[in-house]
Curated annotation (Swiss-Prot):
Keywords: ATP-binding, Cytoplasm, DNA replication, DNA-binding, Lipid-binding, Nucleotide-binding. SMART domains: AAA, Bac_DnaA_C. Belongs to the DnaA family. It is found in: Cytoplasm. InterPro entries: AAA+_ATPase, Chromosome_initiator_DnaA, Chromosome_initiator_DnaA-like, Chromosome_initiator_DnaA_CS, DnaA_C, DnaA_dom, DnaA_N_dom, DnaA_N_sf. Oligomerizes as a right-handed, spiral filament on DNA at oriC. Residues 81-104 are annotated as: Disordered. This is Chromosomal replication initiator protein DnaA. GO terms for biological process: DNA replication initiation; regulation of DNA replication. Residues 349-468 are annotated as: Domain IV, binds dsDNA. It holds the Pfam family Bac_DnaA_C.
Length: 468
């Protein structure tokens, strides 16, 4: 009965919740009914607390509907699927060990190299050396915000239960938003949990280079064996596979082999899978088999938190008002923020001056001037009009049809986020509208970004275009 009862609840929750929420928080739950107690198992404490906080009332309501007076009591526990025991490693000769100790990028003609390991610890160290995972990028130094919350939660779940939670996990968004940091954080967490795990991180171009060298050295079988033997494969910027047919063909088979073996795949891209041109449809389809999550430009509070965290790492005191001054003017990505802060700190060290708003304005004058020049209300209006294939005059008009009103609201919200203009100034720029109209538009778009995947995508695309 437990499976059918929970299945009914799942089906109803799937209708009620946004697809991303359902896939991330509810789908991973497992159910067991014993002695009129329904136990829901979450893959980790983070998911358990989130589900209990956000969805407990909905689950209890559905149990009441389906069970009437015989409602089972509800319990939550942290539990994970049993992991199959690893297969015993085949006996290897010293030549085999030496051959496997080189990543495919260095594949050459096979020569027996007599090399022995003192103990298993050396072998593990070698695996970690080959992984290319940056030990500096961990979950504990990743600054969480509304813009990356879902991506961070998914990455944590994958690291706790690789190959089972979400496979593949596909993270997409503009440059410098933290996708690569999350890849490394997952890799580090997997190895922390299991030092014997084979985790490989690489840029997609490295995969292509490895394959080309393997073909040149007649070592394609070694190439296949290397990539298909990993426990987790983390590939950055998958869009660089575009128009590389042979690489796509090989990755297609590698992808299938890893999925069949319950080995984790995490991919990143600068755009949504279906928007990647030059990549075969069968690959784009597979990219969406697991969970696809957008990493968006950080909102103001997150930008401030990032600056404060980086200043702390440098053992520099950064006043709140200074952090807000920088964060309000540099909005596009984390990398830009870090670069600006590094310049400010360097200037302060060279001159011995305290870091004040006036000092920051002087140290970053060229960067701030460029930013103000790039993002103007006029530029926003032109970009939004072009995106929705309407005229700028429509945005300034009194027309209230959905095809014009929604782009106008989006443009107002973008103007509030990307410029330093006040609400009355924004209203004036949109046909002399009142500041309350602008405020309503901003709140409406914020609500729609939570409820509508299309609006969320449009907003992210426009921010990316305006900030590039």
């Amino acid at each position: 009965m437990s499976s059918s009862l929970w299945l009914q609840c799942l089906q109803q929750l799937q209708e009620e919740l946004p697809a991303t929420e359902f896939s991330m928080w509810v789908r991973p739950l497992q159910a067991e009914l014993n002695d009129n107690t329904l136990t829901l198992f979450a893959p980790n404490r983070f998911v358990l607390d989130w589900v209990r906080d956000k969805y407990l009332n909905s689950i209890n309501r559905l149990l009441q509907e389906y069970c009437g007076n015989d409602v089972p009591s509800l319990r939550f526990e942290v539990g994970s699927r049993p992991v199959a025991a690893p297969k015993p490693a085949p006996t290897r000769t010293p030549a085999d060990v030496a051959a496997e100790s080189s990543a495919p990028a260095q594949l050459q003609a096979r020569k027996p190299v007599h090399k022995t390991w003192d103990d298993d610890a050396q072998a593990i160290a070698d695996i970690n050396h080959r992984s290319n995972v940056n030990p500096k990028h961990k979950f504990n130094n990743f600054v969480e915000g509304k813009s990356n919350q879902l991506g961070l939660a998914a990455a944590r779940q994958v690291s706790d239960n690789p190959g089972a939670a979400y496979n593949p996990l596909f993270l997409y968004g503009g440059t410098g938003l933290g996708k690569t940091h999350l890849l490394h954080a997952v890799g580090n967490a997997i190895v922390d949990n299991n030092p014997n795990a084979k985790v490989v991180y690489m840029h997609s171009e490295r995969f292509v280079q490895d394959m080309v060298k393997a073909l040149q050295n007649n070592a394609i079988e070694e190439f296949k064996r290397y990539y298909r033997s990993v426990d987790a494969l983390l590939i950055d910027d998958i869009q660089f596979f575009a128009n590389k047919e042979r690489s796509q063909e090989e990755f297609f088979h590698t992808f299938n082999a890893l999925l069949e073996g319950n080995q984790q795949i995490i991919l990143t891209s600068d755009r949504y899978p279906k928007e990647i041109s030059g990549v075969e449809d069968r690959l784009k389809s597979r990219f969406g088999w697991g969970l696809t999550v957008a990493i968006e430009p950080p909102e103001l509070e997150t930008r401030v938190a990032i600056l404060m965290k980086k200043a702390e790492d440098h053992q520099i005191h950064l006043a709140d008002e200074v952090a807000f001054f920088i964060a309000k003017r540099l909005r596009s990505n984390v990398r830009e923020l870090e670069g600006a802060l590094n310049r400010v700190i360097a200037n302060a060290n060279f001159t011995g001056r305290p870091i004040t708003i006036d000092f920051v304005r002087e140290a970053l004058r060229d960067l701030l001037a460029l930013q103000e020049k790039l993002v103007t209300i006029d530029n926003i209006q032109k970009t939004v009009a072009e995106y929705y294939k309407i005229k700028v005059a429509d945005l300034l008009s009194k027309r209230r049809s959905r095809s014009v009103a929604r782009p106008r609201q989006l443009a107002m919200a973008l103007a509030k986020e990307l410029t330093n203009h006040s609400l009355p100034e924004i209203g004036d720029a949109f046909g002399g509208r009142d500041h309350t109209t602008v405020l309503h538009a901003c709140r409406k778009i914020e609500q729609l970004r939570e409820e509508s995947h299309d609006i969320k995508e449009d907003y992210s695309n426009l921010i990316r275009t305006l900030s590039s």
